[in-house]
UniProtKB/Swiss-Prot annotation:
GO MF entry, a single one: guanosine-5'-triphosphate,3'-diphosphate diphosphatase activity
Gene Ontology BP term (one): guanosine tetraphosphate biosynthetic process
Gene3D superfamilies from the UniProt entry: 3.30.420.40, Exopolyphosphatase. Domain 2 (3.30.420.150), Hypothetical protein af1432 (1.10.3210.10)
Tagged with keyword Hydrolase: yes
EC number: 3.6.1.40
Transmembrane segments annotated in the record for this chain: none
Classification via InterPro entries: ATPase_NBD (IPR043129), GppA/Ppx_hydrolase (IPR050273), Guo-5TP_3DP_PyrP (IPR023709), Ppx_GppA_C (IPR048950), Ppx_GppA_N (IPR003695), PyroPPase_GppA_Ppx (IPR030673)
Keywords carried by this UniProt record: Hydrolase
The protein's enzyme class: hydrolase
DNA-binding listed as a keyword: no
Name by which UniProt lists this protein: Guanosine-5'-triphosphate,3'-diphosphate pyrophosphatase
Superkingdom of this protein's organism: Bacteria
Length: 494
């Protein structure tokens, strides 16, 4: 039963948007129940004396009246409300906060830039997979947080006075999207970054993760345009040229960019280009969570799981009553196959991880029905919350599960953008073979199999006499060989 004691709420009064996240604690992880976001653009109401206008304050209070209704069902100790950059700056912040507390019926805490950076990092550490040593970037409305860390521990924290709303007001006042506007915005951002760049570089990182609306917008653009999800400087420069070509902010049209995000997109883009250039970032991906998730996990006192993806897979297996022994059996066999062909097929470590994940989830469709189980599995993966996996990785997993058996839908493997199409094909082939040879659901009945790859030709060698003694197995592998040949995947079985 859902009781109010299992509910938690985190509210972030940001400089661009106000956000509310309501979650339920379920077996050591969180289940999102409500997410509300309203563009309040508080920072746009700051004048040259750092005084908030009455209109901006009213926009904020109006939004909080919406939030207040949802908070009535949640115990006050389980509500955390924080205010960030604009309310750190505003000389009349006290007036805004007093009324905000009255509306919400709970305290509002103005947090320091360093505390904001720490919470953002915690949110990322709890929800984002990948290497342990990371750089986290969050471009807010009036401040930008940059944090390095390993696992759950931060190694450096910086909160800088630049954001997509303040940069919009300062460098795109006339709403022109000219090269000069971008040049000035980038130059100013690099000057703000310069004093902290050495310290960040000293700590180093293996992966760079973006946790802001700007990065979310970039992700949406790249998914809509069929690009892979990695953000690179070349892609950012390409989007800048597109924006310049549009000429004015009100004319800005980029496939995948929503109207809601368009206003602060150019200013956020300029800041991000400056960060990439100044810190020599090669590639960035989108974080699974940030400030609000950091607040929630902080209230719950949950430890950071060393492997977020594994935790996610375990939770889903439990929820859909997956036969975990069989899932591990298929995964072990698929990894054994991958070990034999990875050099010839040039498969990277992430391919191994994604193949294993697909194996762990391949039978979740059975919880709906045996009929069309692959379609059910794909639907579930597409629509479940999978902390630790990026949107593109979710799409790849769903596509692999859709193609785990029966005729192969090659176009779906080519439409995902987590890995190159050829790699998706290779992973699909290995998954399908592992499922066939583990189908008896007993370790002692899995034969010794040798796989050899030569370009797209796959040669599968079985123990002598195995095919004669296993007529059903032979039928399955003959059918598989035929299905693979339909999509020009030669499979020879000996």
């Amino acid at each position: 039963m859902l009781t109010s004691t299992s509910l938690y709420a985190a509210i972030d009064l940001g400089s661009n948007s106000f956000h509310m996240l309501v979650v339920r604690e379920v077996a050591g992880s969180i289940q999102t129940l409500t997410r509300i976001k309203r563009k309040v653009r508080l920072a746009a109401g700051l004048n040259s004396d750092n005084s908030l206008s009455a209109e901006a304050m009213e926009r904020g209070w109006q939004c909080l009246r919406l939030f207040a209704e949802r908070l009535q069902d949640i115990p006050q100790p389980q509500i955390c409300v924080v205010a960030t950059a604009t309310l750190r700056l505003a000389v009349n912040a006290g007036e805004f906060i007093a009324k905000a507390q009255e509306i919400l019926g709970c305290p509002v805490q103005v947090i320091s830039g360093e505390e904001e950076a720490r919470l953002i990092y915690q949110g990322v550490a709890h929800t984002t997979g990948g290497a342990d040593q990371r750089l986290v970037v969050d471009i807010g409305g009036a401040s930008t947080e940059l944090v390095t860390g390993t696992g759950a521990q931060t190694t450096s924290l910086f909160s800088l006075s630049m954001g997509c709303v303040t940069w919009l007001e300062r460098y795109f006042t006339d709403r022109n999207l000219a090269q000069e506007n971008f040049d000035e915005a980038e130059k100013a951002a690099r000057e703000v970054l310069r004093p902290v760049a050495d310290e960040l570089r000293k700590h180093g990182w293996k992966v760079c993760v973006g946790a802001s609306g700007t990065v979310q917008a970039l992700q949406e653009i790249m998914m809509a345009q069929g690009m892979d999800e990695r953000i690179t400087l070349a892609k950012l420069q390409q989007l800048k040229q597109r924006a310049i070509h549009c000429g004015r902010l009100e004319e800005l049209e980029i496939e995948g960019l929503t109207l809601e995000r368009a206003l602060v997109f150019p200013s956020g883009l300029a800041i991000l280009i400056a960060i990439f250039t100044e810190l020599d970032i090669q590639c960035m991906t989108l974080a699974g969570g940030a400030l609000r998730e950091g607040l929630v996990y902080g209230m719950l006192h949950l430890a950071v799981d060393q492997d977020i993806r594994s935790r996610t897979l375990r939770n889903i297996q439990r929820r859909f009553m997956v036969d975990t022994e069989q899932a591990h059996r298929v995964a072990d066999l698929a990894v054994n196959f991958l070990d034999q062909v990875e050099d010839k097929w040039h498969l990277e470590p992430i391919s191994r991880e994604l193949l294993t994940s697909a194996c762990q989830l391949h039978e979740i469709g059975l919880s709906v029905d045996f009929k069309q189980a692959p379609q059910h599995a794909a639907y579930l993966v597409r629509n479940l919350d999978l902390p630790g996996f990026t949107p593109a990785q979710k799409k790849l997993l769903a596509t692999l599960l859709l193609n785990q058996t029966n005729p192969i839908d090659l176009s779906s493997l080519h439409q995902q953008n987590a890995v190159p199409p050829r790699v998706a094909e290779h992973l699909c082939r290995l998954l399908r073979l592992a499922i066939i040879f583990a189908s008896r659901r007993r370790d002692d009945l899995v034969p010794q199999i040798t796989l050899q790859a030569q370009d797209e030709n796959l040669t599968l060698t079985l123990p002598q006499g195995w095919l004669e003694h296993h007529p059903l197995g032979k039928e399955l592998i003959d059918q598989e060989s035929q299905w693979q040949s339909y999509v020009h995947w030669p499979l020879d079985v000996h």
